[in-house]
């Protein structure tokens, strides 16, 4: 059948195993007010840049997220260390599906992050991803042609 861009898929939130450290790919979604099940977009995603956070900022963020998600939520030491050293967007943890991460090309991600944006935080000039490869859990790339000619 025909698929539409607004179709969604069930959330697959696996925090703290997967969290919003710098470089992860996560599924966009509509807000909780219209999407209480936190269903993920099938076609829209984002790549996290965020910022490094100190312990005080992480504590404050953890408390805000706990008020939203419940007392079960906390940042394990390993997650805290990643946010202190690499950075990310911890306020999104536990509420969005994380499904991958950048394995090379962080300098490209940084250049995209520095692109001038408009009042809606959208790039003034389109930024297009021209080539991407799927890499399995074993670290090997799926070398099938994805419709793009090199």
Regions found by a protein language model. Name each.
Residues 1-150:
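Cyclophilin-like peptidyl-prolyl cis-trans isomerases
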